[in-house]
Swiss-Prot record:
<dbReference type="GO" id="GO:0005576">
    <property type="term" value="C:extracellular region"/>
</dbReference>
<keyword id="KW-0106">Calcium</keyword>
<dbReference type="InterPro" id="IPR033125">
    <property type="entry name" value="DNASE_I_2"/>
</dbReference>
<dbReference type="GO" id="GO:0003677">
    <property type="term" value="F:DNA binding"/>
</dbReference>
<protein>
    <recommendedName>
        <fullName>Deoxyribonuclease gamma</fullName>
        <ecNumber>3.1.21.-</ecNumber>
    </recommendedName>
</protein>
<keyword id="KW-1015">Disulfide bond</keyword>
<dbReference type="GO" id="GO:0004519">
    <property type="term" value="F:endonuclease activity"/>
</dbReference>
<keyword id="KW-0964">Secreted</keyword>
<keyword id="KW-0256">Endoplasmic reticulum</keyword>
<dbReference type="GO" id="GO:0002673">
    <property type="term" value="P:regulation of acute inflammatory response"/>
</dbReference>
<dbReference type="GO" id="GO:0005783">
    <property type="term" value="C:endoplasmic reticulum"/>
</dbReference>
<dbReference type="GO" id="GO:0002283">
    <property type="term" value="P:neutrophil activation involved in immune response"/>
</dbReference>
<feature type="short sequence motif" description="Nuclear localization signal">
    <location>
        <begin position="301"/>
        <end position="307"/>
    </location>
</feature>
<comment type="similarity">
    <text>Belongs to the DNase I family.</text>
</comment>
<feature type="region of interest" description="Not required for free DNA-nuclease activity but required for activity towards liposome-coated DNA">
    <location>
        <begin position="289"/>
        <end position="310"/>
    </location>
</feature>
<keyword id="KW-0053">Apoptosis</keyword>
<keyword id="KW-0540">Nuclease</keyword>
Length: 310
């Protein structure tokens, strides 16, 4: 059988279109930067890697920011934006300092301004009768908008648990979900962060007590078999991404979720990688509105052709 002369060109065009759709997709990441404070800020090699990781993402959650002077994010903006006029500029939104007693951390979202904007935000208040103060660091809930993605609006609920109370904190995210829905008219949710959701902190028998896992409307993108830790001596799926909402679940780019091994990507030794963090980032992509529309048209066309043949 001979190939039509246009076949190679058509194949190349299809590959180009697929690559373009992947490029247009919005990459969302979650990264526990491990004790991100003054000492790490002075480690230039580690900071260079952190900036590279942030630049890979269109929107990234940064956790374990420990900086009472609030200099970390302004410093990052200076490194990301510089003084020149760039086509891509970054902005951020950051929580207040959260935690019990004197130990405090902050959540921060860094995002590309031309792709993402913040609609509104609030700190979840964990004051339920008989079940108070479950979270070590209450979620800093942010409602984002992106005009370029198939799903235009989505809420991100970040969480960094205390290892010993991970099971209860992860389960409590369902109450956060209910609270957000009662305040905002939105159905598309992303729960992401360092859940400490693996190994001894969340043993297999504990999953049956976690509503975020047992309720099928919550879709886990990072599976139990993943390793989000840098140390070779450990293999634990601590960092997770969970979605809720049919629209956002359907908008995920196939095979886009996973762990970003920056040690391998940037050819670092384990010691050099640990200077950056003891966690690898986790990520996934949301389809662009153009890709999503074209995919729906393609499916519709295939169905029509199939119907015509019957």
């Amino acid at each position: 059988m001979s190939l039509h002369p246009a076949s190679p060109r058509l194949a190349s065009l299809l590959l180009f279109i697929l690559a373009l759709h992947d490029t247009l997709a919005l990459r969302l990441c979650s990264f526990n930067v491990r004790s991100f404070g003054a000492s790490k800020k002075e480690n230039h090699e580690a900071m260079d890697i952190i900036v590279k990781i942030i630049k890979r993402c269109d929107l990234i959650l940064l956790m374990e920011i420990k900086d009472s002077s609030n200099n970390i994010c302004p410093m990052l903006m200076e490194k990301l934006n510089g003084n020149s006029r760039r086509s891509t500029t970054y902005n951020y939104v950051i929580s207040s300092r959260l935690g019990r007693n004197t130990y405090k951390e902050q959540y921060a979202f860094v995002y590309k301004e031309k792709l993402v904007s913040v609609k509104t935000k609030y700190h979840y208040h964990d004051y339920q009768d008989g079940d108070t103060d479950v979270f070590s660091r209450e979620p800093f809930v942010v409602w984002f908008h992106s005009p370029f993605t198939a799903v235009k609006d989505f809420v991100i609920v970040p969480l960094h648990t205390t290892p010993e109370t991970s099971v209860k904190e992860i389960d409590e995210l369902v109450d956060v979900y209910t609270d957000v829905r009662s305040q905002w008219k939105t159905e598309n949710f992303i729960f992401m962060g360092d859940f400490n959701a693996g190994c001894s902190y969340v043993p297999k028998k504990a999953w049956q007590n976690i509503r975020l896992r047992t309720d099928p409307k919550f879709v886990w993108l990072i599976g139990d078999q993943e390793d989000t830790t840098v140390k070779k001596s450990t293999s634990c799926a601590y960092d997770r991404i969970v979605l809720c909402g049919q629209e956002i679940v359907n908008s995920v780019v196939p095979r886009s979720s996973g762990v970003f091994d920056f040690q391998k990507a940037y050819d670092l030794s384990e010691e050099e990688a640990l200077d950056v963090s003891d966690h690898f980032p986790v990520e996934f992509k949301l389809q662009s509105s153009r890709a999503f529309t074209n995919n729906r048209k393609s499916v519709s066309l295939k169905k029509r052709k199939k119907g015509n043949r019957s």
